[in-house]
Amino acid sequence: LGVAGVVGNGLKNNHSSYGRTQASILAADIIDRMRANRREAESIGAPYDIVLVDPSPTGTSIAEQDLNAWRTTLASTLPLGTGAISMNAATKKVTVTVQWDDSRGTGGHSIQTFVMETRL
């Protein structure tokens, strides 16, 4: 019985670790996309800015396509996965937030948040 408990805890911890790893990878992915599209990312209107509750964009600009693909990947990789991006135009500081439900890893409904900050 004790071994079963240890194995169960190990599985929960592995699932939580997997979520954090995926969040980190996906945050880095959108930052790489922004750097590849630096001219549009730094343009007036902040085309990459998106809040957690915003729907995914459906337009044809590179920024809109990047955000749509990123949000789709978040939703398919992480339970209830979503993300937000904000950029300070003056400092070029980008904050990427990834949020998901880690209830499998924590044993109850638990929204986890991963934040990555960098400069373009």
Spans of model-derived segments:
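Short, conserved catalytic or interaction motifs in soluble domains
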Residues: 8
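Alpha-helical hydrophobic helix detector
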Residues: 1-5
